[in-house]
C-alpha cells in the first residue's frame, strides 16, 4: 500500500509499505529517500507520536494515509567553555546586603550612593 509523509517544508514523500511494517522500517525508508537519520525523525499520525517498535496496523494507518515528519530537537547541555563563561559573569559576584547591587568579586565597598558605599557585602548565592 502507499502512504504519504509530509515534512515541515511542505514536501510530500510517497512510500510503498505494508501494514505489518514497523515504524523503524518506515523511518529507514524515509532515510533512503531524504537522507535524514532515523534517530532524528519523529512521525506523527492523528496527533500522536509513533513509537519505533509498533506497526502501521497498530495505529490503524491505512492506504493513502498521511504521516507528518518533524525533526527531533536536541539540547539541554551547556558546553564547558560556555558554562565557565556564565560562571565568570553571572555567578562569581558579590552582593551588597543593603541595596542588593551586584559587584565584582574584588570589591570591598558598594558602588551605590543609596546605601552610603557600605562595606557589608556577601558572595552571590550559587544556582542549584
Curated annotation (Swiss-Prot):
One Pfam family from the record: Ribosomal_L40e
GO function terms (MF aspect): structural constituent of ribosome
Residue intervals of the Ubiquitin-like domain: 1-76
GO biological process: translation
UniProt signal peptide: none
The keyword Membrane is assigned to this record: no
Domain of life: Eukaryota
CDD domains: Ubl_ubiquitin
Keywords: Cytoplasm, Isopeptide bond, Nucleus, Ribonucleoprotein, Ribosomal protein, Ubl conjugation
InterPro entries registered for this protein in UniProt: Ribosomal_eL40_dom (IPR001975), Ribosomal_eL40_sf (IPR038587), Ribosomal_zn-bd (IPR011332), Ubiquitin-like_dom (IPR000626), Ubiquitin-like_domsf (IPR029071), Ubiquitin_CS (IPR019954), Ubiquitin_dom (IPR019956), Ubiquitin_ubiquitin-like (IPR050158)
Covalent cross-link Glycyl lysine isopeptide (Lys-Gly) (interchain with G-Cter in ubiquitin) as placed by the record, residue numbers: 48
One cellular component (GO) term of this entry: cytoplasm
Cross-linked residues, Glycyl lysine isopeptide (Gly-Lys) (interchain with K-? in acceptor proteins): 76
Note: Ubiquitin is synthesized as a polyubiquitin precursor with 5 or 6 exact head to tail repeats. Some ubiquitin genes contain a single copy of ubiquitin fused to a ribosomal protein.
Family: In the N-terminal section; belongs to the ubiquitin family. In the C-terminal section; belongs to the eukaryotic ribosomal protein eL40 family.
Protein name per Swiss-Prot or TrEMBL: Ubiquitin-ribosomal protein eL40 fusion protein
Source organism of this protein record: Trypanosoma cruzi
Gene: FUS1
